[in-house]
Amino acid sequence: MANQHANHSINDFKQFVKKHPKLIKEVRKEQRSWQDVYENWVLFGESDPIWDPYREPEEASEAVPETPQKNDFVSKMVTAVKKMDVNQMNEQINKMSQSISSLQSLLNTFSGSGQKHSQPGSGQHPFSFRKD
């Protein structure tokens, strides 16, 4: 039973790829992997607007966007989250934290006369991040 379902799914995906020849070109240019295309196909389905750029020209003009703008926003957010690199985001947050800390110490240096330690721990970072 599961084997028949898998074969049916694979055949459906093959038909989908035949309808979207630009996907084949992208995979051959190594801009995308078949695994990535298949996962997106399973998640979003055939009628999602993310496939519009890959349709044949006459098919793209026939395709009417039936999905509301909310689904388009959600799909864009999902793809953006998939593309995020966690280590790079952590590094950027750490740099921003250091910048804020430097700015706070600079402001404390030039702020009011006689207020030397108005904020305890001003040399520390304002946000406490730690590596997992």
From Swiss-Prot:
User: Which residue ranges does the record annotate as region Disordered?
Assistant: 107-132
Where is composition skewed (Polar residues) in this entry?
A: 108-122
Q: Entry's Pfam families?
A: YlbD_coat
Domain of life per record: Bacteria
Name of protein:
Uncharacterized protein YlbD
Q: Which organism is it from?
A: Bacillus subtilis (strain 168)
Q: Give the source lineage, highest ranks first.
A: Bacteria, Bacillati, Bacillota, Bacilli, Bacillales
